[in-house]
């Protein structure tokens, strides 16, 4: 941004990428929990922008492979930090499975990114909203009853089988 040519480079990029449709490109996303309506770039562009700095750590091929990983996380106290960090890094961006039956209590606030206004809410709902605000295109498979005899088969076998499960 401090580059003298930044403004001209940005104009060239926008014109090349969007032609004359900069204002009409992208999609609208509505977050009903906070009443916000935002205009953002398309799925592929958002993913590329969010993972752009990973290029110094892993190759584009590796990034694409990790994007397609399906990760399951059971328990969203410490697991909530794992989930959001995976999403920030662009891992498991196609599909993520989360299982948690518990509600957020004050004693959880030392390990869960949430505020006191979230106390009493289901941990899985708090995290799902945070993840959708990072990546509104992600497919989340939520198991608000946690894992039990009824949900286990679906968690490990339906849609896409998890490549990796954290508990």
Predicted regions and their residues:
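Adenine nucleotide-associated cytosolic modules
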Residues: 1-167
